[in-house]
């Protein structure tokens, strides 16, 4: 019993978001995916507007992304785990292709989670977006376009390639995957939301640095 207790304490002490370990604070993919981010480190957030945890981490993640400057190429992919999510995925892809996603991203989250609006309904999403400044005709034209359908198929391929089964999940450089859930398990106990999100950002810092160093060494 004493040995077991000491072992647990040692494992807990080894957990550190600033020095993350594969298999604990993050996962290393067996099959890394090619990225198209040029000299920058690609960071992808897989998320869903339906997801309360995605809503909760969004402010911390936005702040982290803004602090990275030109070091990273950041993008979001709205997941599709079942057909009921299709309209929200299509809405995000539409807004992204219109270059309007960032302007209304937080507002959609608030509409869904703070004000409990049924934005999973296409008509209600369209009405909501019109009220927050999106041109309805341009939105609907893009929403129905072949380009959006093509992007959605590409997103589905990414979802399968990265074996994403829950959200939020954040992929760095096509090879490292982390999330608040990784940190919750690693830190043990019951970390508060702010602690959990701060630790996740620290892991992202370390993974971006790791990826950048590997890229520099490969030149």
Task: Give the residues covered by each predicted segment.
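C-terminal cap of thioredoxin/glutaredoxin-like
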Residues: 132-219
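Long, low-complexity, intrinsically disordered polar/charged segments
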Residues: 6, 101-106, 138-142
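Extracytoplasmic thiol/disulfide redox context detector
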Residues: 1-86, 204-219
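Structural microenvironment flanking redox-active thiols in thiol-disulfide oxidoreductases
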Residues: 69-97, 102-130
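Extracytoplasmic/secreted envelope proteins and their assembly/folding machinery
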Residues: 58-65, 88-92, 105, 122, ...
